[in-house]
From Swiss-Prot:
Reaction catalysis annotation: Release of signal peptides from bacterial membrane prolipoproteins. Hydrolyzes -Xaa-Yaa-Zaa-|-(S,diacylglyceryl)Cys-, in which Xaa is hydrophobic (preferably Leu), and Yaa (Ala or Ser) and Zaa (Gly or Ala) have small, neutral side chains
Name listed for the protein in its UniProt record: Lipoprotein signal peptidase
One Pfam family of this chain: Peptidase_A8
Enzyme class per UniProt: hydrolase
PROSITE patterns for the chain: SPASE_II
One term of GO molecular function: aspartic-type endopeptidase activity
InterPro entries on file: Peptidase_A8
Keyword Ion transport: no
Database matches in PANTHER family: LIPOPROTEIN SIGNAL PEPTIDASE
Length: 167
C-alpha cells in the first residue's frame, strides 16, 4: 500500500470513528442527560462543548473567532495534506493521516455546532487531565508517530523503511 493511500485511509478512519462516536454519545446514549458516567475511579465520560482548541486555549466566544479557528484549521489541514501527498514514508503518512482525520473531525464540530464536543476525562485525586475526544486522541497519536519517525529516520542515523517496508 502506498504512503498516500495509507494516510488517506487513516484520515478517513479517524474522521469516521470520531464523528460516529460523537453522534452515538450525544444522540443515542444521551450523554448530556446522563453525565457524568463513571467508568472507573479515574475515568469518566462527560459532555463538554469546547469553543477553543486544546486545553480550551483560544476560546472563540464570538462568531468571528469561531470562523477564524475554522479557517486556521482548514489551512493547517491543507498544508498537512500537501505533506501527505509528498510523503514517501508510510509511518509519516500514517501520522499525517491521523492528524488530518482528527483535525477534520473537530472542524466539522466547530462548523456545525460552534464548538467541539469532548467526552473523555481522566483524573486521579486532585490531578485531572483535560477533557478530550477521539479526534484529539488521533491528533496526539499522529504527533507521537511523527516524533517516533524523527528519531528513527535516516536523518537520525537509522535507515527508515521505504514504502515496501525495506530498510
Amino acid at each position: 500500500m502506498s504512503p498516500r493511500v495509507l494516510g488517506g485511509l487513516a484520515a478517513f478512519l479517524c474522521l469516521v470513528l470520531d464523528q460516529a462516536n460523537k453522534l452515538w454519545l450525544i444522540h443515542v446514549f444521551d450523554i448530556e442527560a446522563r453525565r457524568p458516567v463513571r467508568l472507573a475511579p479515574f475515568f469518566d465520560i462527560i459532555y463538554e462543548r469546547n469553543p477553543g482548541i486544546s486545553y480550551s486555549l483560544f476560546r472563540a466566544q464570538s462568531a468571528m473567532g469561531r470562523w477564524i479557528l475554522v479557517a486556521l484549521t482548514l489551512f493547517a489541514i491543507l498544508l498537512l495534506s500537501i505533506w501527505l501527498w509528498r510523503a514517501t514514508n508510510r509511518l509519516v503518512a500514517l501520522a499525517l493521516g491521523c492528524i488530518i482525520g482528527g483535525a477534520l473531525g473537530n472542524a466539522i464540530d466547530r462548523i456545525a455546532a460552534g464548538a467541539v464536543a469532548d467526552f473523555y476525562y481522566f483524573h486521579i485525586g486532585s490531578f485531572s487531565w483535560y477533557v478530550f475526544n477521539l479526534a484529539d486522541a488521533a491528533i496526539v497519536a499522529g504527533v507521537a508517530l511523527l516524533i517516533l519517525d524523527a528519531f528513527t529516520s535516516e536523518e537520525a542515523g537509522v535507515p527508515a523503511p521505504d514504502s515496501e517496508g525495506h530498510s
